[in-house]
């Protein structure tokens, strides 16, 4: 699925267009074997999802690869990310597993911006500099990866709750 990097001067930051896939209040989701390219915003954006699996995805360019705000029993496995922003981001996660993924980013591999409980990050590889420039770095076209894993609940806005039961191996 090609998002074509559509720019919208009335969009977020005066440039962002639509997400490639957007789901809200959904359960029992399986996305497998899909290639998501040149997202005009996030490749996958969701609010309040449960029992979701993402397997064997290839995400290239765009902003965030997978951005989940509110998720329970989520599995992200065997995916390859080459993003111009965070590979996986969001928060309010309960029982999320991110396993055997390759993350090449010009921002962060995994960025937690809200609380999470039961997060497991297993056998993932984080590699910079990014293949594609950071989407909002303008003429600078910054490619350096800032962090492999960044746990910063409340960094964007007040986010109440705990970060607990985190495993990184």
Predicted regions and their residues:
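Extracellular/periplasmic carbohydrate-active domains that bind, remodel
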Residues: 1-169
């Amino acid at each position: 699925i090609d998002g074509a990097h559509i720019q919208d001067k009335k969009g977020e930051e005066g440039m962002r267009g639509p997400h490639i896939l957007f789901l809200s209040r959904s359960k029992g989701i399986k996305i497998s074997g899909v290639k998501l390219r040149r997202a005009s915003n996030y490749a996958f954006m969701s609010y309040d999802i449960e029992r979701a699996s993402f397997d064997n995805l290839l995400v290239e360019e765009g902003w965030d690869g997978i951005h989940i705000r509110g998720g329970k029993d989520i599995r992200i496995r065997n995916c390859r990310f080459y993003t111009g922003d965070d590979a996986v981001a969001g928060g309010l996660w309960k029982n999320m597993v991110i396993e055997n993924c390759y993350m090449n980013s010009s921002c962060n591999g995994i960025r937690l911006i809200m609380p999470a409980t039961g997060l497991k990050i297993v056998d993932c590889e984080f590699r910079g500099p990014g293949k594609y420039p950071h989407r909002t770095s303008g003429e600078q076209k910054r490619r350096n990866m800032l962090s492999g894993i960044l746990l910063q609940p409340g960094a964007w806005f007040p986010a109440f709750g705990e970060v607990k039961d985190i495993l990184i191996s």
